[in-house]
Every structure is written in structure tokens, then in C-alpha cells.
Amino acid sequence: MYFGVQMYGVSKEWKQDPEGFLKKIYAAGYRQIEPCLGVRVDARDYGFWLPEDLEQAMPLLEKYHIEVRAVHIFLDEYHYEREFAILAELAQKYHISWFVVKSPARLAKDVLDETAVRYRELAEELEKAGAGLLIHNEKEDICIRVNGKTAYEYLLEACGEKVGAEVDVGWMYCGGVDPEEFL
């Protein structure tokens, strides 16, 4: 098993010297990176990549035997269908196994139920392209309770088996839940 580097936190280092950055993480034993990808919004100033940034990075990633197995994606919360084709193409072209989303901004039961419907639909579309969908937790969706569960647990259960979890144990701990007990 190899560990990966979540690129959001090291975006400055990546921008300053991509090759030097990859040399360092390779020497440290990392073999994967996990970029944050904005599909229709250019937020590169905030550490996000666009699909063309991923394409440009691939030759350098291949040179250092670094894979992109998962990508955090930031989509229009109510119009995922516009991104289906783009995500399917990325999955097939770069062998991305997982696309990672987060909980909605508003963590009320009705919003979580609506989001679960959209996430199931997105997961079904990604499955056709050979990829899956994971939900990444943050502090807020651990702190807020819905029907006696964390909002994160509620959303995962509402999504069903087609959608998995990418548990951020740091945020879980900050939210007051023991990650070991949760897992």
C-alpha cells in the first residue's frame, strides 16, 4: 500500500517547483497525489487544479512514478449532470479510481436527502466510467447531528452502497468523534 499527498495543503510548493516537489515526495516514499479539481471554476489561486492542469502534470507525474488515483472535485451543487462527461473522460484517460466530494454547505435533513439522491446519480455515472464516488468529511458534518447520527454518517447511509467514505480522521477528531471508534 502506498500513501498519497493531498495537494491542497502543498499547492504553494507544487507551484514553485513541481519537479522538485515530486522528487521530495518520491524520496519520502509517496507514490500518489490527490489534487483538488475545479471542473468549471478557476480557483487555482486557492490550490485547485483545472482538468488541463492535470493533463499538463501527467508527464512529470509519470516520470516520478506518481499516480493520481483519487481527485477531490468541486462541482455546482445542484447541476452535477453538466460535469458527467468531463469526469468520465478524466476517469478513463488518467485511470482515476475515485472522485471525492464533500457534504453540502447546509447540513439539514432535507438538504442531505436531496444531496444523497444527486450523489447516487453521480456515483452511477462514474461507475460506467470505471470510477467510484467517496464523501470526505469535515469538522462541521461531524459536529452536527441528524436523526441521532453525525450529518456525515446520515449522508453516507442515505447514499447507500454506491457511495463510499473518505474519512479525514483529523477533522473527525476536531468534531469530537474518536476516529478509531468511528472506523
Give each language-model segment a name.
Residues 14, 42, 144-145, 174-176:
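Short, function-defining helix-loop hinge/capping sites that tune catalysis or transport
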Residues 37-39, 139-140, 169-171:
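Short, glycine/acidic-enriched loop or turn micro-motifs at the edges of active sites
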Residues 32, 60, 64-67, 76-164, ...:
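Active-site acidic/histidine proton-transfer and metal-coordination neighborhood
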Residues 176-183:
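A short alpha/beta connector and helix-capping loop motif
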Residues 1-93, 97:
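N-terminal pre-domain/capping segments
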Residues 4-6, 134, 166:
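Conserved Rossmann-like nucleotide-binding pocket used by diverse enzymes
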Residues 161, 169, 182:
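Extracellular glycoside hydrolase catalytic/binding regions
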